[in-house]
Amino acid sequence: MNNLKKIKIQLNGKKHQIKIGYNLKDLLKILKKDNNKVAIELNGEIADKKKYNKIFLKKNDKVEIVQFIGGG
């Protein structure tokens, strides 16, 4: 049995479970996203990239990750 406590969040419109204590930087790491190529909206507000490691996710948070893609 898995004793690690988890919380539910909404990520890009889909429900996900993550470990308690994860911050935005941790979330990007497990999703294998480059911090320099994304913007994160948390509960309707754009999160400050400089504070990703200080913004901890809470139960029922709504997270939207937008990835920048270059083109021509």
Residue ranges and their predicted role:
Residues 1-71:
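Ubiquitin-like/PB1-type beta-grasp interaction modules and other compact soluble beta-rich domains
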